[in-house]
Structure formats: C-alpha cells, structure tokens
Curated annotation (Swiss-Prot):
GO terms for cellular component: cytoplasm. This is Histidine ammonia-lyase. There is a cross-link at A143-G145 (5-imidazolinone (Ala-Gly)). CDD domains: PAL-HAL. Contains an active site 4-methylidene-imidazol-5-one (MIO), which is formed autocatalytically by cyclization and dehydration of residues Ala-Ser-Gly. It comes from Anaeromyxobacter dehalogenans (strain 2CP-C). It catalyses: L-histidine = trans-urocanate + NH4(+). It holds the Pfam family Lyase_aromatic. The modification 2,3-didehydroalanine (Ser) is found at S144. Belongs to the PAL/histidase family.
Length: 508
C-alpha cells in the first residue's frame, strides 16, 4: 500500500480519495516535521513575552479582549473544543470523515499553525489504525471555517466525543465507541492540548473541502459516464452522429464541449445502427436537443466541474486557521483564511454543473419511453397495457431532477451573522458541500436509470449492433440485469446498475 508523505503543499485530490477509502496511508514528511517544530517553538516563545496573542492567551471571537491567566491556558484550549462541539445530524460517512482527518493533518503539516508534533502524529495514527471521529454533518456556517465539525474531530484527540473503530481493510463492520475507548482499543493515548492547539484544530475549511473533494471526484467520473449513457440512448433512438463532428466543436472553441464530443465520437465509432439510417430512406433531419446538444451540455458541465477542481486542488493544501504562525519572520498574525467563500462558490458551481447531466439525461429517457418519439413500444414494455415497462423509472428520474433544482439554489449567496456580530459575513460552505454531494448522488441514479432504459432499447433494435464500446457496456450491464420481458420491481434493477456505476464497471 502506498504511503503518502504529507507536507502541506503537494497533496492531490486523488490522494485524498485514496486515503479516504483506505487505499493509501499517510505519514509526515521530514521537511514538514521540522517546520512544525519551528512553528511550535515560536508559539512557546511568545507565551513568555507578556503580550496578548489571540487564541493563545485570550478568549475567542467577541471574547478576544479577555486575557487568560497562564495557569488556565490548557483549560482554555480544552474548553474551546468542548464548547464548539455542537454539531447535529447524521455523522459524516467514514470516507468523508477520514478525508477530514487527512486534510486537517496536511494543513497542520505546513508548519504555520503552531501545533505540536505529537498532536499531529496522533491524527495520523488515528488514520492508520482506523479511529474515525464521529462528525455530525450540520452546524457549520463556513466561517470561522468549519468550527463544529472540526471540534468533533478534536474531541477524539483529547479522549472525548465518539469515534468509529474501522481499521482499513477490516472485514468486521465499524464499531461506534466513546472517543477515549476507541483510542485505547487502537493502542493510542489522548493528548492534553497546549496553548494554540485547540484553535489550530478547529479553525479551518477542511470539512467542506473533504465532502466537496469526494463529491467532485465522483462528479468527474459521472461526466464521462453521461457520455456513455447518452451514446447508448442515441443508438437506441437511431440518432445521428453528425452533430459531434470536430469542425462543429472547433467553430465554438469551448474546451469541455470539444472533449465531450471527442468522447462521444470514440464511443460511437463503427456503429451498425448509425449506418442503417444514413441512406436515402432516412427522413430524420435533426435530432432533439437532448441528443444533438450533448457536447454543449455535457461539455459545459465538464467546464464547471473543472473550475471546482481548481479551487479544491488549492484548498486541500491551504492554511486556513487563525492566527497563523510564521517562524521565518517571528510573527503570529491574525487574518481571515478561515472564510470558506472560495470553496462555497466552487461547490455551488459543482452542483449546478452536475445537475445538468441529470436534467438532459431525464429528457433522453423521455425520448426512449415515448413511442411517438422513439418508434419503439410504449415505455419499452412487452405487451404494453398488461405491462407498464419503464413508465415509472422515468418518473423517478424526473423527481430527482426536480429535487436537484431545489438543491441548486446557491448556498454561497446566503450569510447570517453570528458570534455577537463579530462574524458578520459567512460562506455557508458546508451547506454548499452537503447539497453538492446530494446532487451528485441524484445524478448517479438518473444516469443509472438512463443506462437501464437505453439497454432495453438496444435489445429491441436487434439484430442491428451498436458501436463496439456501447455494445461492451451493454453486455456488462446485462451480466447484472436481464432484459425486461415482463414487469418486475424496477428498484432492484436501478440499484444494480447504480452499483455498476459506483464500481466503475461501465467505464470504458
């Protein structure tokens, strides 16, 4: 198993997914270890200068004017974690929670947070031994960072809160335990937080970045899968390949469109179905937009998803706590890197971009099940009337598309003041992340429905064969889901194709 060396500078989004899913380990890079030590030494030195340093020997937020006696500084950090652990709702899934731990460790490895090496090593040991904090999804407004989610992470470090014990690769299901017990069972000991450490742990954008990164990576795969689903539908509807010609795309010059069209051309190469309706007997002039404009719509989605990638690729290596500790200059400086606006905006774009993959997919499903548009039996049903076929599968897709329209209302245009007005503009970045995650989940299901319905259409076009890559995907789908010869409970089929999507089994 690969071991990633965290330095706060070079972590990639794919590496985040690898650690989150247990496919890679993480350790502290030697150069980062030295930076962490120097940063901590500066914090310790400043404790002796008699000056007020925010969050080190003062209260927090609107309580920043309160000086804390030296004897109470450890208690101050513990109280910060305890008081801020006020999240509610379902816990983050294990992969997202592991991504959260990784991102916080990576940011601390930059050496500008004042954390002790021992505390950072405990975070990494938790990842290694499968101690995954129970982190409620809700309670963050995205500035000062994701305070509540990160406080729930920090609780486990001090032997409080709750954690799942889920060693990577273990066959047993995760066990939910008190945080201290989870550490003990994993052979780890909690830490007593020193000045600045509580603040270094809870102040940052890592929760929204963790959820957003995994949603983004899933959306990227779905953007490619949307081309496959669309190609399968096009074949089932005897649609034209001509709108995907490279000269059409070059005349506009949008990169995502060019990429999507090239993928569609590759998927559709060598199609018998396409050749069958190119002669003088074919009276179709133009296909509906949901077929003809796939490069434009899928391409725009790719471009929006790509914008989000750029933001998150920077954010996973970003120092976002406050204050920041700069040992080279000897300064400890308060700023606003904890504000999640860049991430919130990007995740709103991700949700909107991905939603269009589902919206156009649902319209293609309508083309398939509508006999006046497809020339196939109504709802692709055998003995229609007695059987309803895929009638309600299309309705399910429509329901998810409409749900996405609600979810795509941008979180980042909202703000609500908190902390007695000191935190008077916030990003709602975690809300944007959770919405984007659900939108992407809905897109996956809509594409699974399209693949299921399009496969039925291809069956009905036999003996003509589709393009080889479409035929290969059709064959893999049929290994799990048989042809619909009479009505059955379609939720099982939708779930089976959704699992194929999740496994990447249809990626060609």
């Amino acid at each position: 198993m690969e071991t990633l060396l965290l330095d706060g500078e070079t972590l990639t989004l794919e590496q985040v997914r690898a650690v989150a899913t247990g496919a890679a380990r993480a350790a502290l890079a030697p150069a980062a270890r030295e930076r962490v030590r120097r940063s901590r030494a500066l914090v310790d030195a400043r404790l002796e200068d008699g000056e007020a340093h925010y969050g080190i020997n003062t209260g927090f937020g609107t309580l920043a004017e309160v000086r804390i006696p030296r004897a109470d500084l450890e208690r101050l950090q513990r109280n910060l974690v305890l008081s801020h652990a006020a999240g509610v709702g379902a816990p983050l899934p294990l992969a997202e929670a592991r991504a959260l731990v990784l991102l916080r460790a990576n940011v601390l490895a930059k050496g500008v947070s004042g954390i002790r090496e021992r505390t950072l090593e405990l975070l990494l040991a938790m990842l290694e031994r499968g101690v995954v904090p129970v982190v409620p999804e809700r309670g963050s407004v995205g500035a000062s960072g994701d305070l509540a989610p990160l406080a729930h992470l920090a609780l486990v470090l001090i032997g409080d809160g709750e954690a799942f014990l889920a060693p990577p690769g273990a066959a047993a299901p995760p066990e939910r335990l008190p945080g201290g017990e989870a550490l003990r069972r994993a052979g780890l000991e909690p830490v007593v937080l020193q000045p600045k450490e509580g603040l270094a742990l809870v102040n940052g954008t890592q929760a929204m970045a963790a959820v957003g990164t995994l949603a983004l990576l899933r959306a990227e795969r779905l953007a490619a899968l949307a081309d496959l689903a669309g190609a399968m539908t096009l074949e089932g509807l005897l649609g034209s390949h001509r709108p995907f010609a490279p000269e059409i795309q070059a005349a506009r010059g949008q990169p995502g469109q060019i990429e999507a069209a090239a993928h569609l051309r590759a998927l559709l190469a060598g199609s018998e179905l396409n050749a069958s309706h190119q002669g003088p007997g074919c009276h179709k002039v133009q296909d509906p937009y949901s077929l003809r404009c796939m490069p434009q719509v899928h391409g725009a989605a790719r471009d929006g998803i790509g914008f989000c990638r750029g933001v998150l690729a920077r954010e996973v290596n970003a120092a976002t706590d406050n204050p920041l500790v700069f040992p080279d200059t000897g300064e400890i400086v308060s700023g606003g890197n904890f504000h999640g606006q860049p991430v919130a905006l990007a995740l709103d774009v991700l949700a909107v971009a991905a939603s269009h993959l589902a919206a156009i997919s649902e319209r293609r499903v309508e083309q398939l099940v509508n006999p006046s548009l497809s020339g196939l039996p109504p709802f692709l049903a055998p003995q229609h009337g007695l059987n309803s076929g895929f009638m309600i599968a299309q309705v399910t897709s429509a329901a998810l598309v409409s749900e996405n329209k609600v979810l795509c209302h941008p979180a980042s245009v909202d703000s609500i003041p908190s902390s007695a007005g000191r935190e008077d503009h916030v990003s709602m970045g975690m809300t944007a992340a959770l919405k984007a995650r659900q939108v992407v989940e809905n897109v996956r299901t809509c594409l699974a429905i399209e693949l299921l319905v399009a496969a039925q259409a291809l069956d009905l076009r036999a003996p003509l064969r589709p393009a080889q890559r479409v035929a290969d995907a059709h064959a893999r789908l049929r290994e799990r889901v048989p042809h619909l010869s009479e009505d059955r409970a379609l939720y099982r089929d939708i779930e089976a194709v959704s699992r194929l999507v999740d496994e990447g089994a249809l990626e060609l």
